[in-house]
Structure formats: structure tokens, C-alpha cells
UniProtKB/Swiss-Prot annotation:
Record-stated family: Belongs to the UPF0102 family.
Originating organism: Shewanella sp. (strain W3-18-1)
Protein name, per record: UPF0102 protein Sputw3181_3835
SUPFAM superfamilies: Restriction endonuclease-like (SSF52980)
Family matches, as InterPro entries: Restrct_endonuc-II-like, tRNA_endonuc-like_dom_sf, UPF0102_YraN-like
Higher taxonomy: Bacteria, Pseudomonadati, Pseudomonadota, Gammaproteobacteria, Alteromonadales
Top-level taxonomic group: Bacteria
Annotated GO MF terms: nucleic acid binding
Length: 108
């Protein structure tokens, strides 16, 4: 069984193999959290990592709720403000189901 931090490590490694550069992990604010902050070319990428050992109750991609998307967007906006970044960004999801990794670019 993979737990949260192990899933994030696996997702980070997968994204680095795809050419992204790691910036920061587990950025927390009172109103939201960003699992991974990465860079890809000139884009800053805010990544939500979801893990499910089985899909019988819904897959990892379906586990991202509208409320969670709102919190991630708010956290990313705050991150860009406090770091004084005026750069293009996107939101990706890495869904790990069992031993399969699915990377959804520009997910929301």
C-alpha cells in the first residue's frame, strides 16, 4: 500500500522523468494545499496527487472535487503573489491507481 507522501514521491519522480523540474512540495495555507510545485519550460505547474489502491469506489481522477479545485486555485494564486511571480501556470493531476500512473496535463 502506498501512502500520501510515497504517492507524492512517485508522482514527482514521474514528472521529473517527463522533463519537469521540482520546486517545492506540500505548500500549505489555511485555505488550501498544493501537493507539488513544478516547472515545465516557462510554466509553473501546480500538481494535485491522488492515489487509490483500487477503483471499486471510484478512480483517483474522480477523487478531485470542485471544492478541492477551488482551494488549489486559491492556494496557487496566493503562492504566485507571495513569490511575486507573474508567469503562466497550469494545474495538473497525477492519479496513481495501483501501480499505474496517469498524468493529466492542464486538468482544470
Amino acid at each position: 500500500m502506498i501512502l500520501g507522501q510515497a504517492a507524492e514521491t512517485l508522482a514527482q519522480s514521474h514528472l521529473e522523468q517527463q522533463g519537469l523540474t521540482f520546486v517545492e512540495r506540500n505548500v500549505r495555507y489555511p485555505f488550501g494545499e498544493i501537493d507539488l510545485v513544478m516547472r515545465h519550460k516557462n510554466h509553473w505547474v501546480f500538481v494535485e496527487v491522488k492515489y487509490r489502491s483500487a477503483t471499486q469506489y471510484g478512480g483517483a481522477l474522480q477523487a478531485v472535487s470542485k471544492a478541492q479545485i477551488g482551494r488549489i486555485r486559491l492556494a496557487a494564486s496566493h503562492y504566485l503573489q507571495i513569490h511575486r511571480l507573474d508567469v503562466p501556470c497550469r494545474f495538473d493531476v497525477v492519479a496513481i491507481e495501483g501501480h499505474q500512473i496517469h498524468w493529466l496535463v492542464d486538468a482544470f
